[in-house]
Amino acid sequence: NLKHPQSSKEYFTRFCEEQGFLCEIQEDIENLTVRKGVVYIAIKQQDVVKVVKQGRLEGLKCGKDFGLLAYNDIPSYEVIDEGITSLSIDWEMMGNEAANFVLNNVPIQKYLPTEVRLRKSL
């Protein structure tokens, strides 16, 4: 079950429309066919692995034949298929904000900056 905010679908679709990008949201990737010239965005870590493996099964190379953008960076994205590009918040900043809340009981509602870590998957 996807724990990612469902409102992201609306914002993603709107962004694509405004930029003139064709987009499709496919929540079930069990039967995904990876296509040449398409960029995939994976929210869950296991979906990153599934897309890369499926691309290989179809004789396609990530970063050359298809693109992949992962949500929330992890260290292994640096080494999977020469690097998976990720979109992520600054986790250290989030940890500091959470610690400040716990230690000082200071409520926060704050947007954290998003970083793109560009690697060879795009």
Language-model region placement:
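Bacterial carbohydrate/catabolite-sensing allosteric modules
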Residues: 1-122
